[in-house]
Design a protein with these regions (language model features):
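A short SAM/SAH-binding and catalytic strip from SAM-dependent methyltransferases
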Residues: 139-152
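A short acidic, Gly/Pro-enriched loop at the edge of an enzyme's catalytic core
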Residues: 128, 132-140
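Class I (Rossmann-like) S-adenosyl-L-methionine-dependent methyltransferase catalytic domain
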Residues: 2-74, 79-131, 149, 153-156, ...
């Protein structure tokens, strides 16, 4: 006979899954998906970097290579796979996850050309509903996903994504800072907007302790600002034990 504790846990898990499904299929996220789909269908250069890995992520690859032998890496929202290929080349078993098929096909082609296909697994799925078992990865890289997630959906993201890390695993996050501009002279009166049908969130340094401090140890925060680009690159580590969750609400 199942215990009341089991039933409560099962009910809570089912409720969280239902919320994640509803969030992933919200009108805003459907429009956002449509925006990225159209960019790939256009067939030209993307508005974001798509070939060379970002220096901050290269640093993390070097760090992981020194500390973990034969580790597993998840590139969340991998796009055309510039970081997926980086970690595979460094010798790691790497999973590239994206919710669009078009960029995954590009990764597959690049992996074959670089003779890295045996180290790479590609999955189609949403960050809020990743089709992966918990406690799987030594490192999770999110370059440019979290800043497209509404604040109301952060708890779903944290549950889904951080749960994929092994205890003691590393989490590298790259997101827009408030210095990011879509175009010269852009003015904003709030820390989020909807631009060309996709949601963008802009962060300041103190945000990361508030959002992630209840679940991760923050190891380093690097700010990058060049031209219109403004980013924070944050390296965190999931503790071996359980930390308190951070309560968040709002937009």
């Amino acid at each position: 006979m199942r215990s009341a504790r089991y039933e409560a846990q099962h009910s809570r898990a089912a409720s969280e899954t239902s919320k994640a499904i509803a969030a992933a299929n919200s009108p805003l996220y459907r429009r956002q998906r449509g925006y990225f789909t159209r960019v790939y269908e256009a067939g030209g250069p993307t508005p974001w970097p798509s070939t060379e890995p970002t220096p901050s992520v290269v640093k993390v690859a070097r760090l992981l290579k020194r500390r973990v032998r034969g580790g597993r890496v998840l590139d969340l929202g991998c796009g055309e796979g510039r970081h997926t290929l980086l970690f595979a080349k460094a010798g790691f078993s790497t999973v590239g996850l994206d919710y669009l098929l078009a960029p995954l096909k590009m990764v597959a082609t690049r992996a074959r050309q670089a003779r890295l296909a045996r180290r790479i697994r590609l999955l189609i799925g949403d960050a809020l509903l990743p089709p992966i078992k918990p406690d799987t990865f030594d490192l999770l890289v999110d370059y440019g996903c979290f800043h497209h997630v509404k604040k109301a959906d952060w708890p779903n993201y944290l549950d889904a994504v951080l749960g994929l890390l092994k205890p003691g695993g590393y989490f590298h996050l790259s997101v827009f800072s408030t210095k990011f501009k879509h175009y010269p002279g852009e003015r904003r009166t709030r820390n989020w907007n909807v631009h060309r049908n996709h949601y963008d969130r802009f962060f300041v340094k103190r945000d990361f302790a508030r959002i992630f401090g209840g679940r991760c140890e923050i190891l380093a925060i690097e700010e990058e600002h060049k031209g219109l680009d403004g980013f924070f690159h944050v390296l965190m580590r999931k503790p071996s034990g359980m930390l308190l969750r951070t309560d968040m609400g709002g937009r």
